[in-house]
Amino acid sequence: MFSNLLFVPEEISLPDIPFQRFATLTGAFYPGYSSSTFTSHCSALQIDASLRPRRMSMGERKKAYIAFALACNADILLLDEPTNGLDIPSKTTLRRLLAAYADEKRTILISTHQVREVENLIDNIIILDEQGLALAATTEELTRSLTFGSLSPAAKAIYCESSLTGEEGIAVNT
């Protein structure tokens, strides 16, 4: 069961061994793990997997762990704030790798405050608040039922904030 599930936390904490060694040892628990895919993803993300985590920046550790996670070929991939700590080119590469990874047999669950960085990858949106589930809808349903941008005074705003050009926010599409 757990060999079909992989979690990538926001902050990566790893043993102080070369990342390639970590990937080899931990990859053994995932039947779909591919060392060649790991190497390819490390190359795409410009990561030197021979380094130990303490010699890597936060963003480098995250990229290495994401390369490992994708190489495990798990059916369910949970990503917590996957773009935090990544530079712009790495975010672009991450989106490309996730798009290639996604298929009908796999589920990718992304927890993020930076929706714009992954919006092209999203099929369904779940929004949680203090009370629990605030919204669950497909992107298509949201596009049909909501409008985003400048709001008129008559608009029934779901969310609104002041900007230099007036009120910006989300309203029910009428």
Question: What role is predicted for each listed range?
Answer:
Residues 3, 7-64:
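ABC-family P-loop ATPase nucleotide-binding domains
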Residues 118-120:
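A short, surface-exposed alpha-helical micro-motif characterized by mixed small hydrophobic
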Residues 136-137:
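ABC ATPase "signature
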Residues 77-81:
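Catalytic Walker B motif of ABC-type/P-loop ATPase nucleotide-binding domains
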Residues 106-114:
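Conserved H-loop
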Residues 91-104:
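Helical segment within the ABC ATPase nucleotide-binding domain
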